[in-house]
Amino acid sequence: MTAPTDLSPTLQLACDLIRRPSVTPVDADCQAVMMQRLGNAGFKLEPMRIEDVDNFWATHGTTDGPVLCFAGHTDVVPTGPVENWQNDPFDALIDEHGMLCGRGAADMKGSLAAMLVAAERFVADHPNHKGSVAFLITSDEEGPAHHGTKAVVERLAARKERLDWCIVGEPSSTTLVGDVVKNGRRGSLGATLTVRGKQGHVAYPHLAKNPIHLAVPALAELAAEHWDHGNDFFPPTSFQISNLNAGTGATNVIPGDLVAVFNFRFSTESTVEGLQQRVAAILDKHELDWHVNWALSGLPFLTEPGALLDAVSSSIKSVTGRDTKASTSGGTSDGRFIATLGTQVVELGPVNATIHQVNERILASDLDVLTEIYYQTLVKLLA
């Protein structure tokens, strides 16, 4: 295993960013490095620190044409047990197999480096390009995500900022870089359900009301329900119970209440209001004394074939020789906030096989491939 030397500009920058321990919401000066580079390339910089989160918006070009934005996050998830890593997770080493190892290599400091180097090259090659190249970067994607991209998008919307196309650098690829891009994501609707009973002694059930016995049939019906059939772009909406708690810990006490935590990952065939109404109808049918706290993490979004998806797909083809697959699978991303502006959003990044894991790693050479794909996309849309 050797430390990276004589590397491409993209790999040099990726290693610099990985060496900065930017666990959510700490940025560890990753954005300062990026802004300095972008400023030197002629970008107009707008730092936006919101509460404890660092963000920035940067633009290069004119306001009378289309805007292509690169979006991403400098924060990473915790490393887990450091002793289980093959190297220090913030050392950014390239091993004997050519793998770049470190927290954030895939998710998503590698993408940030590729985006930035591609943009530097593009504005140098095409100083009078059409429209604008933009960057929207945050240090709060892996955490609560209240003061990151969501808050920046709200500010951009308030001042009617134009944003036609957006490439989010999330690690979309599965086996080979560019084999999959995300052209949408399911919505995420969470809930905490409380079913109230009456606490009592297990030997005197007639004096109590067991919320477990009452709630289980309703939960079973919710789990068996077919919420929709999906469509050409999305699988059917799914319902999953993630936590179920009741009882005092004593073996002779009927609990007074039951708490169930569940989540919908829903397609564009369902609405938040529709799902909530159907849940309420099932709970009422079982005559439960219930209360639900709902938490919407994001609405579903979809970018159908058009200028952005066509440019990304053809760039992948020209650089790698491979056809890409557009998919809406997986969890949520900050693309859900950007899509509210009416923006076409595509996620394209490295292979995601080891994200959030111990020994997170990607093939180092993939970042140079990704840089070229980003560059070719810029050329197709703005040159």
Curated annotation (Swiss-Prot):
Zn(2+) 2 binds at residues 107, 142, 356. Pathway: Amino-acid biosynthesis; L-lysine biosynthesis via DAP pathway; LL-2,6-diaminopimelate from (S)-tetrahydrodipicolinate (succinylase route): step 3/3. Binds 2 Zn(2+) or Co(2+) ions per subunit. It comes from the Bacteria. Its cofactor is Zn(2+); Co(2+). The keyword Ribonucleoprotein does not apply. Keywords: Amino-acid biosynthesis, Cobalt, Diaminopimelate biosynthesis, Hydrolase, Lysine biosynthesis, Metal-binding, Zinc. PROSITE patterns: ARGE_DAPE_CPG2_2. Homodimer. This is Succinyl-diaminopimelate desuccinylase. It comes from Pseudomonas savastanoi pv. phaseolicola (strain 1448A / Race 6). The lineage of its organism: Bacteria, Pseudomonadati, Pseudomonadota, Gammaproteobacteria, Pseudomonadales.
